[in-house]
């Protein structure tokens, strides 16, 4: 059995470690040829997870044809949302190699140009591949340490989804199936912005009560966008791992890049400098613009999210943003 993972960053590497530890051969693709060479030579991803050993049944490559040409059980995409269209197009050009292969997407956010969620981008391009979203509270380092997490595999094909879960679920990746593919992605996108807000509150030393208030209000904003986008609501999604679970994890620990980013803002660091240094790592900064555009399109109000947008992009004062977040 072989699975290919496109994206050799922290999360892709961690997933590769978790799968390979349970006997699955993994192809791991990344763009950085030097880092890929280090992985195969030293069995460590020196750029992203330098302290974790990669088992011998992980083969890394910077040649995307190599990972698409094998008979994969599935292909897992662990790449930023803004790069997803390019990667899906590359897969589409190799359809003779991987037609009908299930695609599992771990990307979180909204595409800036189209205002589409990751599954919508993939379904537009990969019309012959079953599309699933793999999402939930899951820090890469904990997965690499073989610590358990509960995540969701969401998609329209229940029979195939449950079959995939039997293949990839183990004592580290505890996976449940859900058909609500859009609802899962709404929670995944908004939680990063809410986490920035929680970090700001914590950085200003406004207390745990205020952080809890922001999490509660943030959950309501997830529900608001969820209803506007889906025209209905599934409580199993809203209070499950991909929404409530991921929101709690991302908003309550400095191990979260988004909360850590907000903490630095709350402590008075220059916002533009922080954005320049963290743009590729902090998903909330790239999600907030298309999110606000989508909210306007759907005619919904998201007070916390618009406050973070105004703080990052419209130069409102930190005190004003905090007042709006807590009001």
UniProtKB/Swiss-Prot annotation:
Write out the annotated subcellular location: Cytoplasm
Please name the InterPro entries in this protein's record. 6-PGluconate_DH-like_C_sf, 6PGD_dom2, G3P_DH_NAD-dep, G3P_DH_NAD-dep_C, G3P_DH_NAD-dep_N, NAD(P)-bd_dom_sf
The UniProt keyword set, sorted, is: Cytoplasm, Lipid biosynthesis, Lipid metabolism, NAD, NADP, Nucleotide-binding, Oxidoreductase, Phospholipid biosynthesis, Phospholipid metabolism
| Reaction(s) the record says it catalyses | sn-glycerol 3-phosphate + NAD(+) = dihydroxyacetone phosphate + NADH + H(+); sn-glycerol 3-phosphate + NADP(+) = dihydroxyacetone phosphate + NADPH + H(+)
Q: Which GO terms describe its cellular component?
A: cytosol
Catalytic residues (positions): 191 (proton acceptor)
Q: In which residues is NADPH bound?
A: 10-11, 31, 108, 140, 257, 281, 283
- Pathway membership, UniProt: Membrane lipid metabolism; glycerophospholipid metabolism
Annotated GO molecular function terms are:
glycerol-3-phosphate dehydrogenase [NAD(P)+] activity; NAD binding
State where sn-glycerol 3-phosphate binds.
Answer: 108, 136, 138, 191, 246, 256-258
* Enzyme Commission number(s) of this protein: 1.1.1.94
What's an example GO BP annotation here? phospholipid biosynthetic process
Q: Which family does it belong to?
A: Belongs to the NAD-dependent glycerol-3-phosphate dehydrogenase family.
* Function recorded in the entry: Catalyzes the reduction of the glycolytic intermediate dihydroxyacetone phosphate (DHAP) to sn-glycerol 3-phosphate (G3P), the key precursor for phospholipid synthesis.
Q: What is this protein called?
A: Glycerol-3-phosphate dehydrogenase [NAD(P)+]
Report the source organism.
Ehrlichia ruminantium
Q: Which gene encodes it?
A: gpsA
């Amino acid at each position: 059995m072989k699975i290919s993972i496109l994206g050799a960053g922290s999360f892709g590497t961690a997933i590769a470690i978790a799968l390979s530890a349970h006997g699955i051969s993994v192809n791991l693709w990344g763009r950085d040829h030097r880092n890929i060479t280090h992985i195969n030579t030293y069995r460590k991803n020196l750029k992203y997870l330098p302290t974790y050993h990669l088992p011998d049944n992980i083969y890394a490559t910077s040649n995307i044809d190599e990972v698409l040409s094998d008979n994969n059980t599935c292909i897992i995409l662990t790449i930023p949302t803004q790069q997803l269209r390019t990667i899906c197009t590359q897969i589409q050009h190799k359809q003779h190699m991987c037609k009908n292969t299930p695609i599992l997407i771990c990307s979180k956010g909204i595409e800036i140009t189209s205002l589409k969620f990751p599954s919508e981008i993939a379904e537009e391009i990969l019309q012959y591949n079953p599309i699933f979203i793999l999402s939930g509270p899951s820090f890469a380092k904990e997965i690499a340490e073989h610590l358990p997490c509960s995540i969701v595999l969401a998609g329209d094909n229940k029979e195939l989804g449950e079959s995939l879960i039997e293949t990839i679920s183990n004592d580290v990746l505890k996976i449940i199936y859900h058909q609500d593919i859009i609802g899962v992605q709404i929670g995944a996108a908004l939680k990063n912005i809410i986490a920035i807000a929680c970090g700001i509150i914590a950085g200003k030393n406004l207390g745990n009560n205020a952080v809890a208030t922001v999490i509660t209000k943030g959950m309501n904003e997830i529900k608001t966008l969820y209803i506007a986008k889906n025209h209905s609501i599934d409580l199993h999604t809203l209070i499950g791992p991909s929404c409530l679970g991921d929101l709690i994890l991302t908003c309550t620990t400095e191990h979260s890049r988004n909360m850590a980013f907000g903490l630095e803002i709350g402590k008075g660091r220059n916002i533009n400098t922080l954005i320049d240094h963290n743009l590729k790592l902090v998903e909330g900064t790239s999600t907030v613009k298309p999110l606000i555009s989508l909210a306007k399109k759907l005619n919904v109000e998201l007070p916390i999210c618009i406050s973070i947008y105004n703080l990052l992009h419209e130069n409102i004062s930190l005190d004003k943003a905090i007042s709006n977040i807590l009001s």
